[in-house]
């Protein structure tokens, strides 16, 4: 029986191995044929369906299961270039299927390279918002369901630790810039050295000033030898942006570049000129008139979204209201987008967080309550409706001061909007209702104040001052339309007024003052002010510094330091001898001897003779080769003892630099005109100097970047090594043998006789390594008897000799 079973098993194993080899061979043949089809792909041909492209069977099955069969224009042109491995800049209208244009090449390129979990991260997709990243990830799951790749979603608002545990096993990642950079800096086992493809969805938004530093930091972690795909409805062509992404000869694919309009053809676009204080009235009237439709209302700030949502929710317009802004938690944002997508009739108040890429089904209206910052933002906002050849309508609310500038910006982008007027009989005023609610609810009033400030700030920071002019807006009336008792104070507006007053010319101020004086002369003269009562506190504050001598004393002092003649002063006293010069000495030893000799003489004639003696010159000390110091007082004599104080009397030194040969030169040497002309034309010298300096700074910049990159790499490696050591220590601690608690029955069995090994021989007890083990308790006699019986029973079962010895013992 045994040989026959072995023969059957061996035959079955051989057949299974043979079928496995055939399957692998068939897969390799399909793969090689697929690679050949991609190499022979014609980039100029126009493809209509996914089956016409060289796509693998798993991808084609996923597309068919998700009901994707026909190619759009952007998909037909971009996928063929991406399959060839070229960098692509894709630009197409909103709702034209740009997501599949980069997801299909990702799956195909990784499939052709037989990517597995051991190869690490193969593709990275960066999205500007969390909602768009979730949407891309869901599409990737649908069309990639038959592949074996592992895909992950990395966005803010989720647990960082859970993402770190799974990140090292991912092949495809969909992420937002901030969270991706956090993982690149902090996650130890996350490597990107083997990355094959980088995709930036809504690339113009990702590469603007808001994400510039983050994107630059992410690019620094990625290998330069990769394929890069950029997609957006308004694509960038700036050389600086393309150089930052290390694009190599990119293919610019703009399928609607020659179209008459940059927006979908079935989109009806209108604008309404309504003053700022009447915007909320117009919006409320519009919502009440369209209760059986699905609408998105865009505003410029999250505070406005919250205020309009809370106030309209209290007034109950008769349609479900939702609000979406960046300050909400991720769970709430996801719940709101899901509810709005599934709703048949609803109104969503949102900021620009929902303006790009999000695919809400069957949106009827897009209302822009606030003027967009530029034409690109307008195009992305209205792109939430009229998607996939469906009908849609968009309305833009404009203040009279914004109309001219915004229409000019839209014309430059080939966007045509028609003006419509609001029917007066349909418009309802909600000003009194808002005032009543703000009076009763302080929180709503505070929210309204914040909404007012955030709107004014959003207008103030705009660069396009032709369209956004804060001075032409009626802010007081706008505050009243929000239900506020008055316009809140805004610091930056007050600062502008102060700056204007400060920068006003003196001539204007002089003319103004002159006009005021002339008016006063023409009219009645000003009456003198009545004498006010001056208290002791007023006199105290009017006091001058006590250590400063009065003015009348300064009149007594001549310029040379001598006391002025009393005859020349108006306040001369009759006592002329009250202030008189006693003696005056000059510095020096001779003057001191003269003092001693004059002190011995007491006659008036001797003192007069000394006063008229010829004065000697003061001492002159040579400090340096060029500088000298006159010693004419004792204070000057003390200066000679301090080198630090003498420095201010010395001249400034000259700084010398030494060339390679050791010769000294001044720091700045003037060149002759002839020598300058001998070196060529001035413009040529300037251009040559700029080129040399640019090359030098570029080399230095590259060296600095390489050093910084090396430091970051070393720091990351140290952190990873430290984390590996911690993990290894934790594993060692888990593998350490634990002490087993004492068991009476087991110890009794050991003490009751013997323990028998599998060979039937007694094993010597191993010495215990424990420091201290408690002594076992005394075993009762009935347990000993039970142990002996058990031992006897175990011995009886083993061999025939044991059975005979047991019977002999019982009989005897």
Curated annotation (Swiss-Prot):
Substrates-to-products reaction catalysed: ATP + H2O = ADP + phosphate + H(+)
Gene expressing this chain: dbp4
Enzyme nomenclature, EC number: 3.6.4.13
Domain Helicase C-terminal intervals: 279-438
Phylogenetic lineage: Eukaryota, Fungi, Dikarya, Ascomycota, Pezizomycotina
Example of a GO biological process term: rRNA processing
Sequence motif DEAD box, residues: 201-204
PROSITE patterns named in the record: DEAD_ATP_HELICASE, HELICASE_ATP_BIND_1, HELICASE_CTER, Q_MOTIF
Similarity comment: family membership: Belongs to the DEAD box helicase family. DDX10/DBP4 subfamily.
Sequence motif: Q motif, positions: 48-76
The name this protein goes by in its record: ATP-dependent RNA helicase dbp4
């Amino acid at each position: 029986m045994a040989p026959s079973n072995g023969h059957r098993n061996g035959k079955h194993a051989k057949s299974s191995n043979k079928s496995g080899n055939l399957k692998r061979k068939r897969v390799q043949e399909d793969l090689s044929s697929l690679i050949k089809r991609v190499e022979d792909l014609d980039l100029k041909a126009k493809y209509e369906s996914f089956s016409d492209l060289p796509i693998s069977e798993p991808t084609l099955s996923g597309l068919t299961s998700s009901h994707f069969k026909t190619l759009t224009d952007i998909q037909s042109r971009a996928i063929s270039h991406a399959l060839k491995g070229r960098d692509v800049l894709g630009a197409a209208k909103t709702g034209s299927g740009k997501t599949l244009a980069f997801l299909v090449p990702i799956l195909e390129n990784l499939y052709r390279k037989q990517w597995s979990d051991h190869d690490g991260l193969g593709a990275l997709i960066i999205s500007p918002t969390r909602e768009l990243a979730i949407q891309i990830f869901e599409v990737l799951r649908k069309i990639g369901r038959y592949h074996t790749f592992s895909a992950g979603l990395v966005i803010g608002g989720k647990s960082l630790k859970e993402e770190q545990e799974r990140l090292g096993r991912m092949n495809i990642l969909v992420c937002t810039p901030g969270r991706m950079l956090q993982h690149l800096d902090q996650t130890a086992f996350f490597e990107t050295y083997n990355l094959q493809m980088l995709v930036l969805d809504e690339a113009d938004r990702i590469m603007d000033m808001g994400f510039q530093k983050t994107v630059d930091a992410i690019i620094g972690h990625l290998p330069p030898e990769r394929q890069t795909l950029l997609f957006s409805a308004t694509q960038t062509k700036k050389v600086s942006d393309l150089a930052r992404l290390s694009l190599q000869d990119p293919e610019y694919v703009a399928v609607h570049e020659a179209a008459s309009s940059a927006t979908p053809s079935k989109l009806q676009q209108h604008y309404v000129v309504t003053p700022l204080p009447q915007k909320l009235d117009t919006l409320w009237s519009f919502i009440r008139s369209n209760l059986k439709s699905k609408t998105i209302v865009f505003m410029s700030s999250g505070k406005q979204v919250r205020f309009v949502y809370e106030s309209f929710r209290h007034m109950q317009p008769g349609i479900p209201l939702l609000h979406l802004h960046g300050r909400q938690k991720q769970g709430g944002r996801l719940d709101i987008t899901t509810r709005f997508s599934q709703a048949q009739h609803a109104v969503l108040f949102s900021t620009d967080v929902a303006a790009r890429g999000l695919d809400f089904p069957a949106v009827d209206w897009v209302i822009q309550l606030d003027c967009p910052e530029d034409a690109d933002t307008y195009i992305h906002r209205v792109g939430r409706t009229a998607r996939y050849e469906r009908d849609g309508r968009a309305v833009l609310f404009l203040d009279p001061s914004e109309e001219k500038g915004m229409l000019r910006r839209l014309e430059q982008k080939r966007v045509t909007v028609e003006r419509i007027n609001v029917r007066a009989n349909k418009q309802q005023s909600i000003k009194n209702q808002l005032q009543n609610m703000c009076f009763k609810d302080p929180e709503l009033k505070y929210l309204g104040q914040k909404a007012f400030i955030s709107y004014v700030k959003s207008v103030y920071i705009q660069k396009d001052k032709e369209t956004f002019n804060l001075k032409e807006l009626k802010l007081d009336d706008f505050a009243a339309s929000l239900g506020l008792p008055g316009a809140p104070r805004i610091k930056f507006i007050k600062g502008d007024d102060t700056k204007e007053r400060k920068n006003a010319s003196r001539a204007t101020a002089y003319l103004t003052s002159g006009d005021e004086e002339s008016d006063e002369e023409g009219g009645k003269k000003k009456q003198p002010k009545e004498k006010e009562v001056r208290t002791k506190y007023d006199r105290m504050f009017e006091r001058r510094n006590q250590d400063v001598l009065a003015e009348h004393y300064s009149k007594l002092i001549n310029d040379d330091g001598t006391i002025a003649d009393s005859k020349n002063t108006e306040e001369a006293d009759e006592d002329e001898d009250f202030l008189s010069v006693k003696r005056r000495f000059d510095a020096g030893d001779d003057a001191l001897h003269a003092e001693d000799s004059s002190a011995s003489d007491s006659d008036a004639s001797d003192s007069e003779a000394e006063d008229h003696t010829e004065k000697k010159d003061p001492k002159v000390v040579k400090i340096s080769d060029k500088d000298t110091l006159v010693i004419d007082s004792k204070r000057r004599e003390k200066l000679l003892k301090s080198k630090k104080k003498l420095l201010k009397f010395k001249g400034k030194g000259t700084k010398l630099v030494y060339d390679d040969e050791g010769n000294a030169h001044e720091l700045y040497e003037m060149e002759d005109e002839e020598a300058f002309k001998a070196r060529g034309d001035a413009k040529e010298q300037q251009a040559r100097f700029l080129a040399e300096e640019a090359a030098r700074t570029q080399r230095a910049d590259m060296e600095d970047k390489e050093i910084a990159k090396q430091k970051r790499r070393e720091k990351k490696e140290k952190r990873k090594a430290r984390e590996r050591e911690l993990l290894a220590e934790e594993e060692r601690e888990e593998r350490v043998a634990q002490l087993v608690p004492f068991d009476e029955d087991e110890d009794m069995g050991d003490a009751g006789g013997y323990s028998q090994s599998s060979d039937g021989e007694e094993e010597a007890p191993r010495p215990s390594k424990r420091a201290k083990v408690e002594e076992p308790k005394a075993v009762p006699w009935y347990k000993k008897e039970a142990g002996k019986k058990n031992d006897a029973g175990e011995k009886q079962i083993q061999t025939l000799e044991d059975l005979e010895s047991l019977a002999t013992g019982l009989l005897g």
